[in-house]
Amino acid sequence: MSAKQPRLPLLGEITAPDGARLTVRVRARDDDAGAPVIVLLPAMGTPARNYLPLVRALHRRGMTVVTTDLRGQGESVPVPARGVRFGYRDIVEHDIGAVLDLVDTAYPTAPRLLLGHSLGGQLGLVHCGLFQPAGLDGVVLVASGSAWYRTLGRDGARWLVRSQLSALGAGILGYWPGERFGFGGRETARLMRDWARQMRTGRYTVPGARVDYERALRAVTLPVLAVDVENDTMAPPTAVDHLCAKMPAARVERLHYACADAGGRPLDHFRWIRHHGGLVERIGAWAERVVLASDRAA
């Protein structure tokens, strides 16, 4: 998707203690102050602007949609380079919470959901377990599973080798030039090490983390809609199930999004963003049934 496409209106900007800056944008339901707010966390190496077709569809379904880039992508600064050091810990323990605080201030009475794609969903869940954000009502995972190579079927060994070589290369170069290798976008060496470690071990183990991230996942109690996508070799059903199994206290509902649900259009780890026809309606229906009904009862 071209960067020349119109940008969403600005909701605010966030500056981290280390000087990193995130831009938060919103497509608001100005006609309904109580409309549910969905906060979209992108996949690794994927700018938030790539999700504009999905944002528009969710907005038409009656939701206010908030977007931000994962650190190092899109409008965020700094760009990963030699000497720029951040990883999973910075995103989990600062960035996601700062975005949710901004949303809480802007929409204090509205129901709020996280929608995480791939890495965005994984790190969003860890944040939820670690901080138990009071204003959050549920989490939607789409094409978001554990990156453990044993969950990736026949492609697992190839992904394991790729991940370890990527982390090694990033360590040598001081960053990962994913745009040159066709995978992952431009990332810091630290983030690539975090990703490669989880790929190898199946565990979210991050040096210097506030607590054990595996323990944080076990503390998630929110409603979770976990969607696997047909033809997705990067987050197949086994990978999604492995991530969900880490949250025994969560109220997890599983859903398979098939090409037939998308009107026969092709799907994979990224194509669902454009071919979202049947998925947006299911997300909206789940939110109304599980999350909004709970809010009304309270």
Residue map of PLM features:
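Alpha/beta-hydrolase-fold enzymes
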Residues: L115-R203
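N-terminal cap/lid segment of alpha/beta-hydrolase-fold proteins
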Residues: M1-A28
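Catalytic active-site module of serine/aspartate enzymes centered on a nucleophile-bearing elbow/loop
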Residues: E253-A298
